[in-house]
Regions:
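An acidic/histidine-cluster motif and surrounding catalytic segment
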Residues: 1-91, 95-148
């Protein structure tokens, strides 16, 4: 399965840390979108609009330019997944995989989208002792996605 690691071009330190924490992982670096460099007009020209009045219901903060860049990075990967018609393991550059992580085993699961790591903002629902259904996941630290 193709593995992409999202990393800002000026954050080589984060990629070095990722490599140190995940030394045996083969991956392709995905150049993250730098949200602070994108103007509102460019977002509109690409078909995106942001609600300037939106407030995060948990953190009680407005959407930041960094969060817009983060979304766009993931959105471009989702488009790539559909275009290439292949599943992708998506990791942000601060993800740390455990020694028990088995990409071959996990890729056998029947799924469209599987969170592998997130910040839990609410209790998750246990499915079978190995899998849980997040109620309100926060962050997109690690997940697998299929083109379906």
């Amino acid at each position: 399965m193709k593995t992409l690691v999202i990393n800002l071009s000026d954050r080589k330190d984060r990629l070095q840390s990722f490599n140190a924490n995940n030394p045996y992982l083969e991956y392709e670096r995905f150049n993250a979108v730098e949200g602070y460099k994108i103007g509102y007009e460019k977002l509109l020209s690409q078909g995106f609009d942001t609600d300037h009045n939106w407030i995060d219901p948990i953190l009680k903060t407005p959407l930041t330019k960094g969060e817009v860049g983060c979304f766009l990075s993931h959105w471009h990967i989702w488009c790539k997944c559909i275009e290439k018609n292949e599943p992708i393991l998506v990791l942000e550059d601060d993800a740390v995989l455990t020694d028990k992580f088995d990409i071959e085993e996990i890729s056998k699961l029947s799924y469209d989208f599987v969170y592998l790591g997130w910040k839990e903002m609410d209790k998750s629902e246990d499915i079978d002792g190995k899998l849980v259904k997040p109620v309100y996941p926060y962050w997109t630290l690690a997940y697998m996605i299929r083109p379906e």
